[in-house]
UniProtKB/Swiss-Prot annotation:
The gene is rpsP. Coiled coil: none annotated. PANTHER family: 30S RIBOSOMAL PROTEIN S16, SMALL RIBOSOMAL SUBUNIT PROTEIN BS16M. HAMAP family: Ribosomal_bS16. Gene3D superfamilies: 3.30.1320.10. One of its GO terms (biological process) is translation. This is Small ribosomal subunit protein bS16. Residues 99-110 have a biased composition (Basic and acidic residues).
Length: 123
């Protein structure tokens, strides 16, 4: 059974509240879970100590037994010092797309042509 440590949504409409749960990867998001491992209340201030509450001992136990935390839960665990999250580096992401690069090249060519024409006219 593939186990995941993930978020299960609770709360009402526009007032989210999440439980950090251990669940089978195939079960629904808010469906059956094996153990409740903590909570996250995004409505609280970021510096509030009750915003993220984790049972670190049980989380370590389940990670040792093969449970995989989701990306968001892994961020919480990294902040709490329970697990290490690898920093993702994608330098290609910042580059514009192919069409945008073509348009920029065309625009630069037009500017260069206009500058050359102005220089010829000035002579």
């Amino acid at each position: 059974m593939a186990l995941k440590i993930r978020l299960a949504r609770g709360g009402s409409k526009k007032r989210p509240y999440y439980h950090v749960v251990l669940a089978d990867a195939r079960s629904p998001r808010d469906g059956r879970f094996l153990e409740n491992l903590g909570s996250w209340n995004p409505m609280l201030a970021k510096d509030d100590e009750k915003r993220v509450q984790l049972n670190a001992e049980r989380i370590k136990h389940w990670i040792e037994h093969g449970a995989q935390p989701t990306d968001r839960v892994l961020r919480f665990l990294d902040e709490a010092g329970v697990a290490k999250r690898e920093v993702k580096n994608n330098p290609v992401k910042a580059k514009p797309g192919k069409r945008a690069q073509e348009r920029a090249a065309e625009k630069a060519q037009k500017v260069a042509d206009a500058a050359a024409a102005a220089a010829d006219a000035a002579e």
